[in-house]
Amino acid sequence: MISQSTLFLFILLIIGLIAKNQSLIVAICVLFVLKWTFLGDKILPYLQTKGINLGVTVITIAVLVPIATGEIGFKQLGEATKSYYAWIALASGIAVALLAKGGLQLLTNDPHITTALVFGTIIAVALFNGVAVGPLIGAGIAYAVMNIIQMFK
């Protein structure tokens, strides 16, 4: 008999294939390999507890590569400060990081909310070709909205 988790992942794989979402397809295939081998017992719990931090680290490395390769240096930083688009990007980066901080708090304090956030991310990735940074940012947005609602109670 196929387990509920295997069936759920298989349905998501089909959605990923229909939507031609490579990230979702690869993620599910990796999870299947881990789940069906001896590696799953060790790696899946680690990924569940540390996966978001690991993902953020990988994204941070990717963002810093142009600095490491010398494509971006102090000259480009100075030139960027002359553009109002750069200032908008700077403010956006700060806002997103602060939202993510609140999201991390929410996911830590209310783990049951994770299910809704993960499902929302899956829908966005599979159907709208979104990027799976959603759970943390989504949790941050949810955290901010929840705090605003609390202010009016």
UniProtKB/Swiss-Prot annotation:
Pfam families: DUF441 (PF04284). It is found in: Cell membrane. InterPro entries: UPF0756_TM. The chain crosses the membrane at residues 8-28, 54-74, 87-107, 117-137. Keywords: Cell membrane, Membrane, Transmembrane, Transmembrane helix. It is a multi-pass membrane protein. The keyword DNA-binding does not apply. GO terms for cellular component: plasma membrane. Coiled coil: none annotated. The keyword ATP-binding does not apply. HAMAP family: UPF0756 (MF_01874). Belongs to the UPF0756 family. This is UPF0756 membrane protein Bcer98_3279. It comes from Bacillus cytotoxicus (strain DSM 22905 / CIP 110041 / 391-98 / NVH 391-98).
